[in-house]
Design a protein with these regions (language model features):
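Bacterial N-terminal signal peptides that target proteins for export
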Residues: 2-10
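Compositionally biased intrinsically disordered regions enriched in Thr/Gly
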Residues: 26-34, 38-79, 83-389
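C-terminal motif of bacterial Sec signal peptides marking the signal peptidase cleavage site
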Residues: 19-22
Length: 389
């Protein structure tokens, strides 16, 4: 799968294929009514002939191993129309196609003159590795109209329910330093068209620019350290940052960032998950404690649920690479173990990074802790109080 392929960026010295474990498979039926209020990208402006009726869906994903794309589609019965673009380019490419009753998709892309330049063919199906079972993904092959240059693609629906003129617009930091031998490719979201989200924009921008600066500083120090010389043929250091929107409403934004960094000369890279949970109404970044009643043992409740879920998973899947000793330490009721939490409609989406509960090759592990398991602890008038009712 393409989500698995993204990890290749961090294993360049050995070109090892890394399997992202614990992907819980979901029934392969087509779901048309999921997230019908999704807001398209800031660049989305329907081209001539695009349908004006139907349900709108916003997707993020990749073509090939690492060509990221944003896609906005309008689904009207069997008809699909919309646009997609590459964040590092920013130019819309028109889309028009069909979807049948079994979810088989064929979408042609065309240039400004109407000439077809490519075709997406794949399957519209429930998303895997998603905290919300009603979200969808489209997976398949992109090719030129004649079938050449065939490349795998995967795009996942984003749960955007922001009203008004506000639109998500990805920003890209891309840098290559040949002298210091590092490359940076980092994305972070901005919300255009509504001043309510200005503080969120500053927080998201600051989070990623600081991480990029820290990476560059570390590379500069490493490069000047005479005891840290590496052969010229070794792969350059890299920092790659991508994100998923876990929740986006007028009041709350939850963004999950995946940061993959590789230090020149290392056996493999590292993967770190950072989540920005932002209270738009009150203009502040949320701490996990903000969701719960005073003195509530929320860490104990979250820990207990995650331990049971991961133990069940390990019993059912002998190839899961989950490690009992790692799990004992990595799921204990300590704040450090639950730094990567995201807000969703269904519950708190907890991410355990590699080596926290499983081997590196297993990839990050995910647990959705439903609000029903935390209902008695959640602050009724707090940020997620309405979800827990």
């Amino acid at each position: 799968m393409m989500k698995t392929c993204r990890l290749l960026l961090f294993l360049l010295p050995v070109i090892a294929v890394v399997a992202l474990g614990a992907c819980r498979k979901q029934p392969a039926q087509t779901q048309q009514n999921a997230n019908s209020n999704a807001t398209p990208s800031a660049q989305d402006s329907p081209a001539s002939g695009v349908a004006t009726n139907g349900e709108r869906f916003y997707f993020r994903g990749t073509i090939g191993d690492n060509l990221r794309i944003e896609m906005a589609l309008l689904r009207d019965g069997e008809r699909l129309t919309g646009t997609y673009f590459y964040p590092k380019v920013g130019k819309n490419i028109a889309l028009s196609g069909t979807i049948d009753k079994d979810g088989n998709v064929s979408i042609g892309e065309s240039d400004d003159g109407g000439k077809q330049t490519g075709v997406f063919k794949g399957k519209w199906k429930p998303a895997t590795d998603s905290p919300d079972p009603i979200l969808n993904e489209i997976e398949g092959k992109w090719s030129r109209p004649d079938g050449s240059k065939e490349t795998a693609f995967l795009v996942t629906q984003q749960p955007i329910e922001i009203t008004g003129a506000a639109r998500f617009a990805p920003k890209v930091i891309k840098e290559a330093n040949k002298e210091k031998r590092y490359t940076v490719a980092a994305e972070y979201p901005q919300i255009d068209g509504d001043a309510r989200f200005d503080k969120f924009n500053r927080e998201a921008r600051s989070l990623i620019t600081k991480d990029v600066a820290a990476f560059k500083t570390a590379e500069t120090v490493s490069e000047t350290d005479p005891g840290n010389e590496t052969p010229a043929e070794q792969t350059d250091s890299t920092l790659d940052v991508s994100y998923e929107i876990r929740s986006a409403t007028d009041d709350l934004i939850s963004i999950e960032f995946t940061e993959g960094d590789y230090e020149r000369g290392a056996a493999h890279g590292n993967i770190t998950t950072t989540v920005l949970n932002y209270d738009v109404k009150n203009g502040k970044k949320l701490a996990l404690a903000d969701l719960f009643n005073a003195k509530a043992n929320y860490l104990g409740a979250i820990s207990s649920y995650c331990i049971k879920e991961l133990q069940d998973r390990m019993r059912k899947d002998k190839d899961s690479m989950l490690d009992a000793d790692m799990m004992k330490s990595g799921t204990s009721a300590r704040a450090d173990n639950y730094k990567a939490w995201a807000i969703t409609k269904k519950g708190l989406w907890i991410t355990f990074d590699p080596y926290q509960v499983a081997a590196f090759a297993a990839g990050p592990q995910y647990v959705l802790v439903p609000y029903s398991a935390l209902k008695d602890l959640i602050k009724p008038d707090g940020p997620v109080g309405s979800f827990a009712k």
